[in-house]
Swiss-Prot record:
It catalyses: orotidine 5'-phosphate + H(+) = UMP + CO2. The lineage of its organism: Bacteria, Pseudomonadati, Pseudomonadota, Alphaproteobacteria, Hyphomicrobiales. It comes from Methylobacterium sp. (strain 4-46). CDD domains: OMP_decarboxylase_like (cd04725). The gene is pyrF. Catalyzes the decarboxylation of orotidine 5'-monophosphate (OMP) to uridine 5'-monophosphate (UMP). This is Orotidine 5'-phosphate decarboxylase. PROSITE patterns: OMPDECASE (PS00156). GO terms for cellular component: cytosol.
């Protein structure tokens, strides 16, 4: 049986910086206020994968937000390589062929604890963006259909905006993860996110993990900012 998540376990700090050195300095400043970090494209291509391996070896959880999407064989082999780094979470786009390939890749690595997350609709998108991209329906419909596909294929969890978390939970059930980006403490600027929610509201909506970037990484005191968000999670 999985142990209950502590408030600190629920916070994932987004390391959206340009170099490994910069990321490591931030991790040092945050200290024990967080123990879960997200590495995406920018840092991933600038020493982030080596950093992910080091952090995982030291017991820190790592979320590789690489949003893989390619032909099946390429995704399968890429996930095999990433699973060996020791990361805890990895994102793939919620297309059936991509998700099945990711599962094959992960399952082929003995002892891998990697959990796969399907990206439904990016939190920078709204209904107008989907119409521009050629989709007939809106965000809510596309999120629900992609979440159902991920559930049926056996993906471990879903990445979605907290505004969709309750609806996604109804689709995927209680045992799969929901990870929500676009989290901003009360009063913080929304930046380039269009569907933002406070930490407490996201937890109440059913999210398991919250991804927070600039409110922590650009704070004068990142450790205090992380602790404040953990406190808000605890009070939800």
């Amino acid at each position: 049986m999985t142990e209950p998540l502590t408030p600190r376990d629920r916070l994932i700090v987004a390391l959206d910086m340009a170099s490994r050195d910069e990321a490591e300095r931030l991790i040092d400043r945050i200290g024990d206020a967080a123990a879960f970090y997200k590495i995406g494209y920018r840092l991933g291509y600038a020493g982030g994968l080596a950093l992910a391996e080091r952090l995982a070896a030291s017991g820190v959880k790592v979320f590789l937000d690489l949003k893989l999407h390619d032909i099946g064989n390429t995704v399968e082999e890429g996930v095999q390589s990433l699973a060996r780094l020791g990361a805890h979470l990895l994102t793939v786009h919620a297309y059936p062929q991509t998700m099945r390939a990711a599962r094959r890749g992960r399952d082929s690595v003995p002892g891998s604890a990697l959990r796969l997350l399907a990206v439904t609709v990016l939190t920078s998108y709204d209904d107008a963006d989907l119409r521009e991209a050629g989709y007939a329906g809106g965000v809510a419909d596309l999120v629900a259909s992609r979440a159902a596909a991920a559930r049926d294929i056996g993906i471990d969890g879903i990445v979605c905006a907290a505004t969709e978390a309750a609806a996604v939970r109804a689709v995927i059930g209680p045992d799969r993860l929901i990870v929500t980006p676009g989290i901003r403490p009360a009063g913080a600027a929304s930046g380039d996110q269009k569907r933002v929610v406070t930490p407490a509201a996201a937890i109440r909506a059913g999210a398991d993990h919250l991804v927070v970037g600039r409110p922590i990484t650009e704070a004068a005191d990142p450790r205090a900012a992380a602790r404040s968000i953990v406190s808000e999670i605890a009070e939800a």
